[in-house]
Amino acid sequence: MRFPSASDPGLLNVIDRYVTPAAQGVGRYLHLLHGNFARDDESERTPFLQALSTAAREITDDELEILLESEWRSRLTAAWLIGFDLREHFRDVLGDLLLASQLCFAGQGYCFALARFGTDEDAQHLAVYLDRYLRRPDCPYDQRWAISALLRIDSRTGSEHAARFLHPGGLWDQWNEAQGRRRPSPPSRFIDELCAHADEDAATRDPRSAPQDAGTAP
């Protein structure tokens, strides 16, 4: 793992350009963390998303790889940029990083990107993660992000990848009960909103680039 330090100016340069640029007085990664930008007023959210979209188009694959080798702030930001620009060739890299779950918070970005890609391949990565970590109540990592991402893919493709986790008494209920929730609630669909912001940006730039719902004519 590469840690930000004076001995690694290449990493510091990429972090300064893409991870820590300030918006409303705080670094970009803090707006991406937990999808915090979605709670901002539109007057603040719009310029933030415009800058994020520009960064997603400008950053090179090599620079993304540098960020994915670093700490959680860099990995989180890289994953959001990958998802925003639909760089699907990073799919397996993000899936492997999600399953490894080496760092806090970074998995949120991996789940967002896989949800944005929205294919059966992405669903498989999310399902493998959930099959492992819903059985680990001692590891409350990114299970909520992963199930939300999986539900988004199911809703757009007509698949039912999430169903085996959500039946009464199944892994989702068991994991929630182990977290101290007596009445497990259905998983939130919050990733739908986060992806909608990216879809709207894509449609604004090029209507042909916005993902189509399953069965919708291009």
List each model region and its residues.
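N-terminal alpha-helical scaffold/docking segments in eukaryotic complex subunits
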Residues: 1-59, 167-218
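Exposed alpha-helical structural elements
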Residues: 10, 28, 47-51, 62-63, ...
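Structural detector for internal amphipathic alpha-helices that build alpha-solenoid repeat scaffolds
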Residues: 35, 43-55, 76-86, 107-119, ...
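Amphipathic alpha-helical scaffolding segments comprising HEAT/armadillo-like alpha-solenoid repeats
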Residues: 56-67, 87-99, 120-133, 155-166, ...
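Short, well-structured hydrophobic secondary-structure segments
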Residues: 63, 71-81, 89-90
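Alpha-helix N-cap/helix-start positions at coil->helix boundaries
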Residues: 72-73, 103-105, 136-140
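Alpha-helical transmembrane segments with an aromatic anchor "belt"
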Residues: 81, 96-103
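Accessory, usually C-terminal, subdomains that scaffold auxiliary metal cofactors
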Residues: 140-149, 153, 160-182
